[in-house]
């Protein structure tokens, strides 16, 4: 045989074409303009390789990547370089758990349901909220779903976002809002904090969304923001870094109606930006409007504790037209990674890890100030902040890479007026030597 297997015979092809009413493959592709079809061949791919040669070739390609195992990283902005305890992968790769899906006969998989229930419980404890779902795709889609919930619950059409919320979250919310015709307004930052006074001029406000700490690393006064939002008749939504909540007051205790965020800091690798795991928490009053799946605890007919998927009438696979959301999946595997990491750390460990992040970032900030750099907002922050550079931050990033350092995010990516500013992050993984190396490299920047 010329091939290991025959994926499709001519008879198979003919039968399938007849079934769909096409005479040929060309008929099947008729709606695709010839101008956009690839007319070339795959000769540039080369001849098939033995597995050993293929692995060698791919390894050489992979070696061209610059990764955080080789170079110290000062890049954050939503995806962070944290240590994942070894127990995370040890447990995650067990056959009992190694699936991204909740099962279609869920009550059979009591172990998986218990793991999700424990994840929900820990997230509620961190955020100070009453109920959490089993997870969402990522923090930003959780934020957009929270905005949709607020508009449906309040029967209002204006979503208000602080400029301290991740710029890409603004884009996702606007995409979500476009279909149902919702309005999206923004509140600027003044001296690093959300200008809540500007809320007075807005009408029909369904919610106000802030980030905690905000995109630029600043820790804002949530209570004042919550009070102003509620006075306007809207829901107060907080996008919170869950690791920071090891030190900061829980949003639920400061007036948040919904707290969402991304669990990536807990045991989930950076992986070029995903996949991660979004968490979604809210109050009992909004429990029946929360998107996604909920695992609840109950007892069986013998009085033994058990776990079930509960309140499923909210979900689109039960009643599509009246569902609270069209999301019908979750990130159960990554949620499990987060819950294993949180369990391994414990309450004291999470606090100590958060403290280490805080101390490392402040040590870097102090060193940069001593070296003559300007910190754009020197207010309270967690593990990232903005530094003003003498040259374009994108060019600075290239020079840092040449020095063996992954630099921070050039803010000119989102705002041309901030082209010389870099959002710098320092996690618990950065050593004093690496901090000194970074400061020295910034001091040696030259104009291109």
From Swiss-Prot:
Its EC number is 1.4.4.2. Signal peptide: none annotated. One of its GO terms (biological process) is nucleoside metabolic process. Pfam families: GDC-P (PF02347). The keyword Oxidoreductase applies. Keywords: Oxidoreductase. The keyword Hydrolase does not apply. InterPro entries: GcvPA, GDC-P_N, GDC_P, PyrdxlP-dep_Trfase, PyrdxlP-dep_Trfase_major, PyrdxlP-dep_Trfase_small. It catalyses: N(6)-[(R)-lipoyl]-L-lysyl-[glycine-cleavage complex H protein] + glycine + H(+) = N(6)-[(R)-S(8)-aminomethyldihydrolipoyl]-L-lysyl-[glycine-cleavage complex H protein] + CO2. SUPFAM superfamilies: PLP-dependent transferases. GO terms for molecular function: glycine dehydrogenase (decarboxylating) activity. Belongs to the GcvP family. N-terminal subunit subfamily. The glycine cleavage system catalyzes the degradation of glycine. The P protein binds the alpha-amino group of glycine through its pyridoxal phosphate cofactor; CO(2) is released and the remaining methylamine moiety is then transferred to the lipoamide cofactor of the H protein. The glycine cleavage system is composed of four proteins: P, T, L and H. In this organism, the P 'protein' is a heterodimer of two subunits. This is Probable glycine dehydrogenase (decarboxylating) subunit 1. It comes from Exiguobacterium sibiricum (strain DSM 17290 / CCUG 55495 / CIP 109462 / JCM 13490 / 255-15).
């Amino acid at each position: 045989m010329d091939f290991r297997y025959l994926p499709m015979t001519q008879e198979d092809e003919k039968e399938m074409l007849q079934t769909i009413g096409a005479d040929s493959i060309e008929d099947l592709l008729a709606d695709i303009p010839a101008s956009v079809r690839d007319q070339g061949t795959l000769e540039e791919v080369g001849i098939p390789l033995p597995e050993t040669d293929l692995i060698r070739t791919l390894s050489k390609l992979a070696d061209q990547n610059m990764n955080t195992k080789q170079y110290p990283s000062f890049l954050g902005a939503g995806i962070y370089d944290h240590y994942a305890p070894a127990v995370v992968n040890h447990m995650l790769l067990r056959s009992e758990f190694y699936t991204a899906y909740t099962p279609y006969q869920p009550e059979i998989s009591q172990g998986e349901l218990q793991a999700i229930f424990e994840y929900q419980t820990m997230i509620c404890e961190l955020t100070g909220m009453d109920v959490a779902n089993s997870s969402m795709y990522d923090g930003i889609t959780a934020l957009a779903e929270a905005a949709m919930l607020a508009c449906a619950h309040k029967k209002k059409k204006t979503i208000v976002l602080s400029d301290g919320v991740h710029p890409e979250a603004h884009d996702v919310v606007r995409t979500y809002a476009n279909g149902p015709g919702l309005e999206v307004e923004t509140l600027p930052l003044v001296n690093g904090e959300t200008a809540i006074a500007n809320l007075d001029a807005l009408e029909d406000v369904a919610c106000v969304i802030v980030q905690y700490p905000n995109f630029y690393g600043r820790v804002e006064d949530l209570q004042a923001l919550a009070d102003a939002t509620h006075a306007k008749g809207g829901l107060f939504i907080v996008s919170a870094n869950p690791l920071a909540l090891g030190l900061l007051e829980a949003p639920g205790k400061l007036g948040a109606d919904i707290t969402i965020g991304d669990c990536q800091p807990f045991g989930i690798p950076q992986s070029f930006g995903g996949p991660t795991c979004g968490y979604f928490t809210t109050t009992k009053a909004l429990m029946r409007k929360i998107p996604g799946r909920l695992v609840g605890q109950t007892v069986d007919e013998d009085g033994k504790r058990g776990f079930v998927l509960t309140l499923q009438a909210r979900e689109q696979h039960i009643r599509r037209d009246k569902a609270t959301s069209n999301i019908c999946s979750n990130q159960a595997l990554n949620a499990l990674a987060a819950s294993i990491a949180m369990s391994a750390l414990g309450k004291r460990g999470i606090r100590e890890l958060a403290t280490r992040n805080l101390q490392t970032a402040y040590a870097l900030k102090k060193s940069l100030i001593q070296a003559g750099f300007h910190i754009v907002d020197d207010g309270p922050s967690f593990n990232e902040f903005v530094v003003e550079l003498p040259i374009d931050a994108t060019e600075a990033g290239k020079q840092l890479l040449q020095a063996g350092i992954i630099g921070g995010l050039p803010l000119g990516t989102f705002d041309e007026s901030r082209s010389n500013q870099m959002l710098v992050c320092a996690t618990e993984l950065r050593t004093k030597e690496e901090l000194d190396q970074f400061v020295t490299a910034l001091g040696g920047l030259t104009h291109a």
